[in-house]
């Protein structure tokens, strides 16, 4: 994930920052407790496509 692109992207739900999880290829919004997929290098920032984060994932 390009760091400059990551600086520009925000969570569509909270408008908060996103972090990149390289292992799962997801953009994570801790405030919304959601992980957005990155498919073929393209972030899919749709709430309907995001998966909810568990408490364990948020603590990691």
Curated annotation (Swiss-Prot):
GO cellular component, as recorded: cytosol
Pfam families, per database record: Trm112p
InterPro entries xref list: Trm112-like (IPR005651)
Gene3D superfamilies listed in its UniProt record: 2.20.25.10
Domain of life: Bacteria
Cystine crosslinks: none
HAMAP family, alphabetized: UPF0434
Protein family according to the UniProt entry: Belongs to the UPF0434 family.
Protein name: UPF0434 protein Aave_2563
Organism expressing this protein natively: Paracidovorax citrulli (strain AAC00-1)
Top-level taxonomy: Bacteria, Pseudomonadati, Pseudomonadota, Betaproteobacteria, Burkholderiales
């Amino acid at each position: 994930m390009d760091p400059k692109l990551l600086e520009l992207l925000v969570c569509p739900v909270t408008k908060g920052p996103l972090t990149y999880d390289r292992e799962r290829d997801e953009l994570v919004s801790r405030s919304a407790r959601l992980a957005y997929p990155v498919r073929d290098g393209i972030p899919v920032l749709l709430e309907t496509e995001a998966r909810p984060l568990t408490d364990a994932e948020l603590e990691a």
